[in-house]
């Protein structure tokens, strides 16, 4: 028998088995964010609000997205299903038009059915609406993404509106910032990262609650995967400014919950959808494209506040975590035929009590933009990362906003002119990749020495390939037989050879 949360709680309260106040959950999401915060030891940037949240959180050092692309990542974290299973193979908007399958049971859908009030403020970027319904929604679908995703005063007021109209039900609020995403391709008047939007300068408008912070390009910390050039440093400095705006927005959102008297009843999670938009970052399944910040703050689990977890966790774990927080079971259902859907992620709540031994995470990417078909699958087991490039005969595709970025244009110009690039790779090896890439990050943290053909690692390679294939079968991956076979479920074996010399 199903029982809505408030009704069940009323009954259990009489029996002394239910909390007098409902639990709530707040998910804060950065857009193309990385480790630009004091909480993750970046001393060049000021992020006091994220740092304060980290002191009340368990900080995960080995958290990864399962896909390094905006819509697929958001769909995956809101369903607990990898992109190849939920159907969001690429970007949702405009000509790309990817959508999750109609029968997918998303987190907001399951929460709503269980009596939890749901809200979203900011960048949604997933569909269809029937799969991702929210009771309260202010997104790019009914307003300006700049206003609901970057104007932190507007975001603050929308959070207040959500809380003021709150009824007796517990709530799940999803605040999806548009910072620090690039905007030089779409709104160049606001700067490469929209760092000028709302800064009070002529024609830029003014965000009342934002105190802009400017950074000297000479002072930024250049990650190993970003060219150490003036163009890239200027890009990073602009990115820092928008990270600062988001950080102040995080502080405003948390203050609204505090003022409403619900912060101490609310599970707060902060993370990002994918890696930063720089070479080897977003759209890649390397470490820079998949490693994410992850802060989990539970008012009921202060034991590990301020601690660091080394456990390997995935954004696929967020749906089971939030369902666990609300004590809502995951249903048994099928999307196609009789294949029952099972979550491969796990609840992170046990990690808030004691350090777990979790050591494996998986990745799956098929598209970004509709023209960027470059399916990749990956598994990371402790410090070993295996990447399978299914279209390895083709050059790796570059997305539009990254292509026109100052960093990449400078890299192209330096490469064609034969000048030093200040980069740890070269474009030829970036474009053309081996089918299998195996890296030992304990000895090769920059992932430059491919061990896949080294006979000393043959047994490890086989083990990781088996792990990856097992996960692909469990998650009903249509690409499981590619590139040298075709999936035919009515035959045995189901992977039939193509004899294509691969």
Curated annotation (Swiss-Prot):
Catalytic reaction equation(s): N-sulfo-D-glucosamine + H2O = D-glucosamine + sulfate
GN (gene name): SGSH
Gene Ontology cellular component terms for the protein in this record: extracellular exosome; lysosomal lumen; lysosome
Transmembrane region(s): none
Protein known as: N-sulphoglucosamine sulphohydrolase
Native source organism of the sequence: Homo sapiens (Human)
Keywords: Calcium, Disease variant, Disulfide bond, Glycoprotein, Hydrolase, Lysosome, Metal-binding, Mucopolysaccharidosis, Signal
Family: Belongs to the sulfatase family.
Outcome (variant: residue 298 to P): In MPS3A; associated with a slowly progressive clinical phenotype; rapidly degraded but small amounts of the mutant protein are correctly transported to the lysosome; low but significant residual enzymatic activity
Effect annotated for changing residue 66 to W: In MPS3A; intermediate/severe; common mutation in Italy
